[in-house]
């Protein structure tokens, strides 16, 4: 893996291929290895970069997180993630880059539009700008409380039911790692995401105006196998309010690992 030293962290990332830079930003998984099958499909067309977000996988903190980062309304981590991606983009290319992601990608576009050539938001589970935002914020508060008091298994079951996660995704999300060490790491990673990201990222400061001013750069992606899920509803709402196009892409919420060949074909039709 490659390394970029940043304030407070060593950011590590996979890099394969040649051509214009395309950065993949992981969501709850946190690590870029989930994108490697997709990267193999695209490496003849792009320099594909798959990041381990700070404090996930091989990326390591060199300074501790501020105590406030676990506060439900803290934007420290999502803003820091966005800054990391912007600094990575600038280190890799003198030109704006392509980006695929979700909520972090939205903050990259909002705060660092100069690094973005084209960007795709794949099923972002954000609620801030929705008419029923308070309802979803309260639901996420309840889910995190349940995880922290009743256990991860029960809380994640509620999470899947509340967001109407598709069976193809629920099966993959619940699949344990192959080794005991892997299962321990998986548990730690999910607990970290629960405490520091479920509430903070999904209710972070993004508005529809943040999209309309850069609408020519944005594509919304919804999976063909995750119809009816909450993240898809978010994209439908963005589309209704801004007319930013939605493109169907193979697979579910984790389509890039479920159906990488078809997923790559859609990206190439968009950007190739």
UniProtKB/Swiss-Prot annotation:
Q: Name one GO molecular function term.
A: hydrolase activity
Q: Which Pfam families match?
A: Abhydrolase_1
Q: Name one GO cellular component term.
A: membrane
Instruction: Please state every residue range assigned to the domain named AB hydrolase-1.
Output: 20-133
Keyword terms: Hydrolase
| Coiled coil start-end | none
EC number of the protein: 3.-.-.-
Question: Its family?
Answer: Belongs to the AB hydrolase superfamily.
What protein am I looking at? Uncharacterized hydrolase SAS2467
Q: Look up and give the organism this protein is from.
A: Staphylococcus aureus (strain MSSA476)
């Amino acid at each position: 893996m490659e390394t970029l030293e940043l304030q407070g962290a060593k950011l590590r990332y996979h890099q394969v291929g040649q051509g214009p830079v395309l950065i993949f930003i992981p969501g709850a998984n946190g690590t870029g290895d989930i994108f490697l099958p997709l990267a193999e499909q695209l490496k003849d067309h792009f320099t594909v970069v798959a990041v381990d977000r700070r404090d996930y996988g091989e990326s390591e903190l060199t300074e501790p997180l501020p105590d406030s980062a676990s506060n439900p309304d803290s934007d420290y981590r999502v803003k820091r993630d966005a800054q990391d991606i912007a600094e990575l983009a600038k280190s890799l290319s003198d030109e704006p880059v392509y980006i695929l992601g979700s909520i972090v990608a939205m903050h990259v576009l909002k705060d660092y539009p100069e690094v973005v050539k084209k960007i795709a938001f794949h099923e972002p589970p954000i609620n801030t700008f929705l008419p029923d935002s308070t309802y979803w914020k309260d639901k996420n508060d309840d889910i995190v409380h349940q995880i922290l008091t009743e256990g991860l298994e029960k809380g994640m079951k509620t999470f899947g039911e509340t967001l109407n996660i598709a069976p193809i995704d629920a099966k993959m999300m619940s699949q344990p790692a192959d080794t005991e060490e892997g299962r321990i790491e998986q548990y730690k990673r999910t607990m970290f995401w629960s405490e520091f990201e479920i509430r903070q990222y999904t209710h972070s400061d993004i508005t529809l105006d943040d999209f309309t001013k850069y609408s020519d750069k944005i594509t919304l992606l919804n999976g063909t196998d995750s119809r009816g899920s909450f993240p898809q509803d978010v994209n439908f709402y963005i589309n209704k309010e801004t007319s930013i196009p939605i493109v169907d892409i193979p697979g579910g919420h984790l389509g890039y690992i479920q159906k990488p060949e078809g997923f790559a074909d859609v990206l190439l039709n968009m950007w190739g």
